[in-house]
Amino acid sequence: MLTDNRLGEATLSPSIHPTAIIHPQAQLHATVQVGAFSVIGEKVTIGANTVIGPHVVVEGPTEIGTGNRIFPGAVIGCEPQDLKYKGGESWVKIGNDNQIREYVTINRATEEGAVTRIGDRNLLMAYAHVAHNCVIENEVIIANSVALAGHIYIESQARISGVLGVHQFVHIGRLAMVGGMSRIERDVPPFTIVEGNPSRVRSLNLIGLQRSGMSAEDLSALKQAFRLIYRSDTPYQQALEELGRSAAHPYVQHFQCFLQKSSYDQGRRGPIPGKK
């Protein structure tokens, strides 16, 4: 266990409940708290001011940053649920100031040396599942009972409502809003609201964009871009090319680039279509 006495102060130790089990090779900062009956395995590193609740399991190799709260029953760093996994050393890496609620599961990546990565200031609500090789950027909210399959990429500030599944290799764009109980089989464009079974792009996420502090000028530019893609009679490829030529605003550039890559890059699943 890691303690820090570099400043000549009295050596501190993590606050560990007597029923918790900590592997001798685990590295815990002196300010870490570990609740009753939790198990911290080998090759686990936990940063300052992180609180591990009761009945939590963290297996390694896993790195957890500072200021995180991990609630009862969460399981982090177990082997991936992937038949291709051959026992190689892969990782979970979690950033800072995240809330990981009750019974969340976060699996390691499949390939040796690969990473399942969670960024900073995210909220993962109860019973959410993050499968192997997923990447969740920053300030994402994932609601209760969301199941993320492998290799999903979620950009910052996205909002994923409850009780839904997301297909493997899907990308979910920045500041997108996914409605509850939807079936997400293709990429979710940034700044949009997507919902349904089958899912469809319904509109821009106007409330979310306003709450994020986006300017009226940027909102107006995104509205024009959205209308060109989803509400005009312009053929899709031609509309993308027009956006690429005229995208002066960074948000419109991101919108166009996401759609272009989703539509034409190898390995991408293509964007969810607009409503009919």
UniProtKB/Swiss-Prot annotation:
Pathway: Glycolipid biosynthesis; lipid IV(A) biosynthesis; lipid IV(A) from (3R)-3-hydroxytetradecanoyl-[acyl-carrier-protein] and UDP-N-acetyl-alpha-D-glucosamine: step 1/6. It comes from the Bacteria. Its main location: cytoplasm. One of its GO terms (molecular function) is acyl-[acyl-carrier-protein]-UDP-N-acetylglucosamine O-acyltransferase activity. PANTHER family: ACYL-[ACYL-CARRIER-PROTEIN]--UDP-N-ACETYLGLUCOSAMINE O-ACYLTRANSFERASE (PTHR43480), ACYL-[ACYL-CARRIER-PROTEIN]--UDP-N-ACETYLGLUCOSAMINE O-ACYLTRANSFERASE, MITOCHONDRIAL-RELATED (PTHR43480:SF1). Belongs to the transferase hexapeptide repeat family. LpxA subfamily. This is Acyl-[acyl-carrier-protein]--UDP-N-acetylglucosamine O-acyltransferase. The gene is lpxA.
